[in-house]
């Protein structure tokens, strides 16, 4: 039964056996932080602290896509009527896992709580962060046409 604080979960459509979920975090850097400092913190401080914990909880892949002013400027070469709105996020972080429970258990880990929750406040504008989750459907991998995500 659904409540106002916990709505009823809708049924997942299609077959999701042997599929992976991708949590996408669209993040902004903390006010006053340069792109270089943000990138440095994400790659050289946050990632080393996080990646082994993710492996411990069955995370399959974690990537960061850094969306700096220089790379956003490349969009001028790709603009067309269908690709005209450029996202202004500083980073897209994508976490791939098979079961949402794995990610939830990782976030409940005492080490995560002690070290990573507070670290996010050192570099991220967490009030502006946007998140979404969806199934991965893969069609090209390493320059080859494929029919699905490799598990």
From Swiss-Prot:
EthD domain location is: 31-126
Which regions form coiled coils? none
Sorted alphabetically, the keyword list is: Lyase
Q: Does the keyword Lyase apply?
A: yes
GO molecular function annotations of the record: lyase activity; oxidoreductase activity
Reactions listed under catalytic activity: atrochrysone carboxylate + H(+) = atrochrysone + CO2
Q: In which pathway does it act?
A: Secondary metabolite biosynthesis
Q: Which Gene3D superfamilies match?
A: 3.30.70.100
EC numbers: 4.1.1.-
UniProt-listed Pfam families = EthD
Q: Does the keyword Metal-binding apply?
A: no
Main EC class the enzyme belongs to: lyase
Give the signal peptide as a residue range, or say none if absent.
Answer: none
At the top level of its lineage, which domain of life is listed?
Eukaryota
What is its biological role?
A: Decarboxylase; part of the gene cluster that mediates the biosynthesis of the tetrahydroxanthone dimer neosartorin, which exhibits antibacterial activity. The two different monomeric units appear to be synthesized by the same set of enzymes, among which the Baeyer-Villiger monooxygenase nsrF is the key enzyme for the divergence of the biosynthetic routes. The pathway begins with the synthesis of atrochrysone thioester by the polyketide synthase nsrB. The atrochrysone carboxyl ACP thioesterase nsrC then breaks the thioester bond and releases the atrochrysone carboxylic acid from AacuL.
Family membership, please give it. Belongs to the tpcK family.
Could you tell me what this protein is called? Decarboxylase nsrE
Organism the protein comes from: Aspergillus novofumigatus (strain IBT 16806)
Q: Which gene encodes it?
A: nsrE
